[in-house]
């Protein structure tokens, strides 16, 4: 039921926080590697894609390793940049159409507000892309993007609450610098993986392979 979506989003974030805490020793070096590679800018998209992959491993019940992470960075160079360009294009369109100086008397403000909401949903769909790709790796990036959009539109309230909770996590991490570097980037990826599997489970569409892994 749609009214349960906010509670489901809270449950997903709570589970992700617990998993991240339990695996802190394993994910802290990976987050530091992501931060270091991201400084080059050129490697930021594939490093981010690889971070999603490592956190998907954690969400599947396996312990991610730094060596596997570095290997994933190499594999995700092209897909990582394709995803980054897709995200940059969408967020640019949103940014151009959202007014930063709202005027309540201007009827166009409703359009601007609607675009802002669509921008939030688009941002969440970007987080969903990689979990969908890892669940069905043989289908490629484009179907994963399509599925991420459909999943976001199918549960918009879940996505918006998830975005608000992630914003709070980032805000807390910004105050506590060490957690921001050591935990928050990977935590966001972990939340995305748990969110996708939570929605698929709610719709009865968990891939058989993932169901077997989750039960191990």
State where each predicted segment sits.
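Faces of alpha-helical transmembrane segments in polytopic inner-membrane proteins
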Residues: 121-125
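Helix-coil boundary and N-terminal low-complexity module in membrane systems
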Residues: 1-111, 115, 126-216
